Design a protein with these regions (language model features):
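Membrane-integrated ABC transporters
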Residues: 1-48, 63-84, 98-102, 106, ...
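Juxtamembrane helix-loop junctions of ABC transporter transmembrane domains
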Residues: 8-16, 40, 47-60, 86-134, ...
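Hydrophobic alpha-helical transmembrane segments of ABC transporter permease domains
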Residues: 20, 39, 94, 98, ...
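An intracellular "coupling" helix at the cytosolic face of ABC transporter transmembrane type-1 domains
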Residues: 28-31, 126-127, 145-152, 156, ...
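Transmembrane helices of ABC transporter permease
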Residues: 29, 33-46, 84-87, 154-208, ...
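Helix-loop-helix
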Residues: 65, 172-186, 256, 260-331, ...
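ABC-type nucleotide-binding domain
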Residues: 70-71, 353-625
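Helix-loop junctions and hydrophobic alpha-helical segments within the transmembrane domains
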Residues: 117, 121, 230, 333, ...
């Protein structure tokens, strides 16, 4: 039940490169939107800076003269205040505009990422899903995507706004008073030093937090799938203990990450307040003494700029942790996008054919006859080899890891219409052989031929389309019964679906459902019994009308009464088809043309049921065990 924990990377080795890749991804789709955002940020910052700068003029030229006037005229002051209000109104409007655009950009980017991730996921080999916890993959779609949303919609515009604000305010402070600017920069240097130390600590723990979230999600998903097994073997306490272990690790990393992040902001804020106090004291002395023409209005503007200067630095410090966490998520996302898709060097395709003058000709219409279209580049000719279902495994060696071979020198010959059964202990390699027939995995040595063609030459989609598979675990989708059966052949008509259901003896129970064939199934068909779910899986294989049928534990989960119903339908389905059967109930394979007994990846016995019983070997032991 356990799946190998496979993380997407422990750390972001090059944050700058990862940030650049993310920005490039965003810009590729939304460069004009980003350009508009930059313009609005510039307008917003400059409007606020201009409004603050005008405070000096407002005090020195409007307010102070009014204090000395015997009959003050407030009209010029009102006009000046109106001018300041216009500056700030422009700033507010621009801020709203760029925030609104960034929300659109962030949601659009996340939509594109989800589309790209799902499209890439559909191209990945089965091996990827066998080695990555499903909960960890789900965590990429949920948690990591959400951290990117926060970064793109909030952190990125705030960082850009902060940088522009820092530059604009610094220039304004230099214009107002150089000594006070130097004092401010000294305090900023102290703030940055403290921020860097704290951010480095929190960044490390944020990366751990992302990985631990994936592990917790993966374990929850695993336990949900295997809850019946957990209860049957009374493993509730062990499962809880393991979960507490993973949850405690998540708590530790999250606690440490947020501990340093929460210390960072108030520390930087207090240092900013100290900077403000120092500038107020020193600036007050300069203004009172009129040093360098420094005025009370200049001091008021400078102190406002001091706050404006410290605020973006605080924001940069605050957003730094969010960006570090988002980059950790971005790495996991891009790791998924960078996964190598399933390779397919096949060039032989499956096509509809018709017979003309004793020759097979390709047909664009569905004819009910199929052939392999084999193009020979050397002499520019094309052969059409009729699809019959002849399968040969010749000296096949295979290992899920190249250094650990699990199948050794497997030889097997299946002529069209034969029923071949694989039996053996758990782990003997029965299911592995079926994984090789449809090329979920590729062999290390030997050859597999299908109708005389090396399967490596056949396009994987066409190879798999020619095979009907009934897996041990029945997967049903959130759709109607009709649509779930039609999944085996999307071109099938309603009549084809019903005929397939009748063949699998599923028609009776389907018609007793509330809406018959239009009954909606949810939660992997949780509203059906196990036997009914298995019958739908068999009907799905039947509607594909394949020449080769693979039954992996097809009846191992069905009760005896249902099994009798299935067996009759399966016997009809297997007529004229090459069928490979894997079953622990050896009674279901007695009528096989050939039974192959596997042990530790080797075929140790082969023959009919009667022949193997007479040998009194491994099969005899299994049958009478």
């Amino acid at each position: 039940m356990s799946r190998k924990q496979h993380t997407h990377g422990a750390k972001v080795d090059n944050p700058g490169k990862m940030l650049g890749r993310l920005l490039n991804y965003v810009m590729k789709q939304y460069k004009f939107h980003i350009a508009a955002v930059v313009i609005f940020i510039f307008v917003s910052v400059l409007a606020n800076v201009q409004g603050t700068m005008f405070t000096k003029t407002l005090i020195d030229q409007y307010i102070l003269p009014l204090l000395k006037a015997e009959t003050p005229d407030f009209t010029p002051l009102a006009l000046a205040i109106g001018k300041v209000a216009c500056f700030y109104a422009i700033g507010v409007g621009s801020t709203y505009a760029y925030n609104r655009i960034m929300i659109y950009v962030s949601q659009g980017t996340l939509r594109n990422l989800r589309n790209d991730m799902f499209a890439r996921m559909e191209t990945l080999p089965v091996k990827y899903f066998d080695t990555h916890p499903h909960g960890d993959i789900m965590s990429i779609y949920t948690n990591d995507i959400d951290t990117l949303r926060q970064m793109i919609s909030q952190s990125m515009p705030q960082m850009l706004s902060s940088v522009i604000t820092i530059v604009s305010v610094l220039i304004s402070m230099i214009i107002l008073n150089i000594p006070l600017t130097v004092l401010t920069l000294i305090m900023v240097f102290v703030m940055l030093s403290v921020s860097r130390r704290l951010a480095a600590q929190s960044g490390k723990y944020f990366l751990e937090q992302q990985q631990n979230i994936g592990k917790v999600n993966g374990y929850i998903e695993e336990m949900m799938e295997g809850q019946k097994v957990v209860k049957v073997f009374c493993h509730e306490e062990e499962s809880l203990e393991k979960f507490n272990e993973l949850n405690d690790a998540l708590f530790e990393s999250a606690d440490n990450a947020n501990k340093f992040a929460n210390i960072l902001m108030p520390t930087v804020a207090q240092l900013g307040n100290i900077s403000y106090v120092f500038c107020a004291i020193f600036g007050g002395i300069l203004a009172i003494n009129g040093f360098g023409g420094f005025t009370l209005g200049g001091l008021a503007s400078f102190l406002t700029f001091n706050k404006s200067f410290n605020m973006p630095i605080n924001q940069v410090s605050q957003q730094f942790n969010s960006i570090v966490m988002a980059l950790a998520g971005a790495k996991r996302i891009f790791d998924l996008l960078d996964e190598n898709p399933e390779t397919d060097e096949g060039y032989v395709t499956l096509v509809n054919v018709r017979e003309e003058n004793g020759m097979l000709k390709e047909s664009k219409k569905r004819t009910g006859r199929w052939a392999w279209k084999h193009y020979h580049k050397a002499d520019n000719t094309t052969d059409y080899i009729e699809l019959k279902g002849d399968m040969v495994l010749d000296g096949v060696d295979f290992g899920y890891n190249p250094d650990k071979i699990v199948l050794h020198d497997v030889k097997m010959y299946a002529t069209p219409g034969q029923k071949i059964a694989f039996v053996g202990s758990t782990g003997a390699g029965k299911t592995t052989i079926t994984n090789l027939l449809n090329r979920f995995y590729d062999i290390q040595d030997g050859k597999i031929r299908y109708d005389g063609i090396n399967v490596n030459k056949i396009k994987k989609a066409d190879l798999r389309r020619s095979m009907g598979i009934v897996l041990q675990d029945t997967n049903l989708f959130t759709a109607t019964v009709m649509e779930n059966i039609r999944y085996g052949n999307l071109d099938a008509t309603d009549e084809d679906v019903i005929a397939a259901a009748k063949l699998a003896n599923a028609d009776g129970f389907i018609r007793r459902l509330p809406d018959g064939y239009h009954t909606m199934l949810h939660g992997n068909g949780s509203n059906l019994r196990q036997g009914q779910r298995q019958l739908l899986s068999i009907a799905r294989a039947a509607v594909a009308d394949p020449p080769v049928l693979i039954l992996d534990e097809a009846t191992s989960s069905i009760d005896t009464r249902t099994e009798k119903l299935v067996q009759d339908g399966m016997d009809k389905l297997m007529e004229g088809r090459t069928t490979f059967v894997i079953a622990h109930r050896l009674s279901t394979v007695r009528n096989s043309d050939c039974i192959m007994v596997l042990e530790q990846g080797r075929i140790i016995e082969r023959g009919s049921h009667d022949e193997l019983i007479a040998q009194k070997g491994k099969y005899y032991q299994l049958y009478n065990g």
